[in-house]
């Protein structure tokens, strides 16, 4: 439906515009008279006191990136599950290409960094240019609205998720000095309970919220692994089927609309009690006819778009240009490795792996994705908010 497409396009454009305005505000604050207060504000530690001891005590910046952004990744996980069930990714063959592209987009930047830093104390920094800032990469694509094919958005989303999973695994196995296996096992246990609940037909929002937040997210946070990965995994445990199916819903609606028609209308603006009762039943049946997965997706998405994403951008995109010049990018092997890894390695790895898979006939490029579209996706994939921080180290 063209009107629906235009409506979604407008939503995506608003998402992108809000994101860009938030980044601009962060830039202004980082280079204003209150820059010091701006940076200090997000470094303040926030936590809980349990028996006089600090518990879950992290900086505000950490809470935003591992806490609030978990909601963003949760929504992304819900969207991905929906695509796996009945969308672009329902055919497993459609996942091979973005997964391969993501792997290529991780390996090439790491190799570029290593080639410039091999034999130096900075060799272990090879993991820095591997990750994509999925939130910003998708924000840029969504800003273009319906000009970007749905298959291209799904391709980038899958690619970015795999990319992020890869980065999390790299951090967990190569950069995490204190990985708590016990906490991780507890987290996996909570995931297993969510999975069993889903298989048993439990549709309670409280059940999944309590286990997802109080169980999976907290234990992953304590384990030392990036807690946003918990959000993606928890999203895949949310039921994708409704309490009543379409045929039952249609039968109930026909019965209720007939009842509504036969209710005697009054001559005032208010409805008769019988009409109100019918509409209440229609509202209830409509709610339970929507799968919990889609209910959560539609309820949380606006919060993520217009509250969480702006906060994330303001907290992370502030770059102070006072002590930063273009020459800094090429001043050290670390900075050069990260810069070239992101700007060249990322798109080369993604596009190269994609063309290789298609050329070898191991995968098929969706018809809506042209070479030009692929080049654009490869280019936007190097969006990365941590680069300025790295350059200052």
Residue ranges and their predicted role:
Residues 1-9, 384-393:
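Single conserved hydrophobic/aromatic residue that forms the stacking wall/gate
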Residues 19-30, 74, 109, 190-195, ...:
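Hydrophobic core segments of alpha-helical transmembrane domains in multi-pass membrane transport
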Residues 77-90, 139-148, 193-203, 356-364:
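C-terminal ends of transmembrane helices
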Residues 83-111, 180-189, 323-348, 375-378:
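Entry/N-cap segments of selected transmembrane alpha helices
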């Amino acid at each position: 439906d063209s009107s629906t497409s235009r409506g979604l396009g407008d939503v995506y454009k608003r998402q992108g515009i809000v994101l860009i305005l938030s980044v601009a505000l962060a830039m202004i604050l980082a280079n204003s008279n209150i820059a010091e207060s701006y940076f200090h504000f997000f470094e303040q530690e926030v936590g809980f006191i349990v028996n006089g001891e600090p518990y879950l005590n992290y900086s505000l910046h950490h809470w935003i990136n591992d806490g609030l952004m978990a909601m963003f990744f949760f929504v992304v996980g819900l969207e991905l599950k929906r695509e796996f069930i009945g969308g672009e990714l329902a055919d497993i063959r459609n996942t091979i290409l973005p997964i391969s592209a993501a792997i290529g987009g991780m390996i090439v930047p790491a190799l570029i960094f290593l080639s410039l830093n091999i034999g130096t104390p900075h060799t272990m920094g090879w993991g820095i240019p591997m990750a994509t800032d999925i939130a910003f990469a998708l924000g840029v694509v969504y800003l273009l609205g319906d000009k970007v094919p749905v298959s291209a958005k799904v391709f980038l989303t899958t690619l970015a998720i795999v990319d992020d999973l890869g980065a999390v695994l790299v951090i967990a196995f190569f950069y995490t000095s204190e990985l708590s296996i016990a906490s991780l096992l507890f987290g996996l246990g909570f995931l297993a309970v969510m999975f069993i609940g889903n298989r048993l037909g439990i549709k309670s929002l409280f059940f999944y919220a309590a286990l997802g937040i109080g169980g999976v997210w907290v234990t992953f946070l304590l384990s030392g692994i990036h807690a946003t990965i918990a959000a993606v995994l928890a999203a895949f445990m949310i039921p994708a089927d409704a309490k009543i199916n379409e045929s039952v819903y249609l039968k109930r609606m026909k019965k209720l609309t007939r009842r509504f028609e036969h209710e005697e209308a009054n001559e005032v603006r208010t409805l008769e009690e019988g009409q109100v009762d019918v509409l209440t039943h229609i509202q209830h049946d409509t709610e339970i006819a929507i799968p919990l997965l889609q209910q959560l997706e539609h309820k949380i998405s606006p919060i993520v778009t217009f509250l969480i994403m702006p906060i994330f951008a303001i907290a992370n995109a502030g770059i102070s240009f006072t002590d930063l010049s273009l020459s800094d990018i090429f001043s050290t092997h670390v900075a050069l490795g990260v810069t070239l890894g992101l700007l060249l390695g990322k798109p080369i790895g993604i596009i190269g792996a994609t063309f290789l898979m298609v050329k070898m006939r191991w995968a098929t490029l969706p018809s809506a994705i042209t070479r030009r579209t692929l080049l654009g996706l490869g280019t936007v994939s190097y969006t990365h908010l941590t680069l300025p921080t790295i350059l200052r180290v």
